[in-house]
Amino acid sequence: MALPWVPQPASAAPATSSKAKPATATSKAKPASATKPAKKDSAAAPSAGPATAGTGQALKLGQFEDWIAYSTPGARKICYALSVPKERLPKNLNRDPGYLFVSYRPDEKVRGEIAVVMGFAVKEDAPAQAVLGSTTFQLAGKDSSLFVHNAAEEGTMLAAMKKSASLVIKASSKRGNATTDRYSLAGIAQALDQAEKACK
């Protein structure tokens, strides 16, 4: 499933703070050693702009700690909240930026769809998981993205995300590399509230 509304990396990343800095979209993971070349997985890069085709640039609704809410103009309105990983492992794996999205698409009757852009082609037949404390949700891979395997669990997962401090995404690349991305959930409740209101 494509994510045509993926924002431009430079404008999408939440601002860094004096605490742990989220990965900026213009930087790539650096090799662990200067003498050891980084491995690179083939990846489908995020689309050039933050809106669907023909709708123009997305409007930033607000930044809430580590999350940003956006909406797109045009007839087919899309609203979403996003964040970038605080930590990506293994550090020596060179890949494109990653994002965690929650989207609202009224024309498609979609509300609160969770999606993760991994920054590399995922191994679609391998297990992928979203871990919130002691609770684990199974994910399904498609191209370079992950979605909740059982869509009926999205509401439960969103409720858990609003109450948790962080979310860990575990997945394997098409080349077989096991990866772990950690996202901060600080500000997600407010960002989701803004995105949902904008797409009522």
PLM regions and their residue ranges:
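A generic "folded-domain core" signal
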Residues: W5-K200
